[in-house]
């Protein structure tokens, strides 16, 4: 299982890449593996400001639909529109082309609540 050291994680299986006050968010390799083949990604919260742990979208797989949760508070400034036509990118490259949203961070102190790669490995039993 791929768990890049440079990223931060949540117990809800989202990953977070921090670049100043812009944060890129997606689902982890573990999450995409558990979901199975992803057929649809829906994010209707573009340009909205959401609080940590609010739902920002859904991901639909062959067998299930799962909510996507904000790992930190912020304004959603970008959605990876390529996922509309190619949702399988989430399965194929969850940490690269399968990213989901970018947000403008509201509260940098919330970053301290995120898990390191090693802490996330403990969550998934890796």
From Swiss-Prot:
Binds 1 lipoyl cofactor covalently. CDD domains: GCS_H (cd06848). InterPro entries: 2-oxoA_DH_lipoyl-BS, Biotin_lipoyl, GCV_H, GCV_H/Fam206, GCV_H_sub, Single_hybrid_motif. GO terms for biological process: glycine decarboxylation via glycine cleavage system. The keyword Transcription does not apply. Its cofactor is (R)-lipoate. Keywords: Lipoyl. GO terms for cellular component: cytosol; glycine cleavage complex. Gene3D superfamilies: 2.40.50.100. It comes from the Bacteria. The glycine cleavage system is composed of four proteins: P, T, L and H. PANTHER family: GLYCINE CLEAVAGE SYSTEM H PROTEIN, GLYCINE CLEAVAGE SYSTEM H PROTEIN-RELATED. Belongs to the GcvH family. NCBIfam families: gcvH, PRK01202.1. This is Glycine cleavage system H protein. It comes from Christiangramia forsetii (strain DSM 17595 / CGMCC 1.15422 / KT0803) (Gramella forsetii). The gene is gcvH.
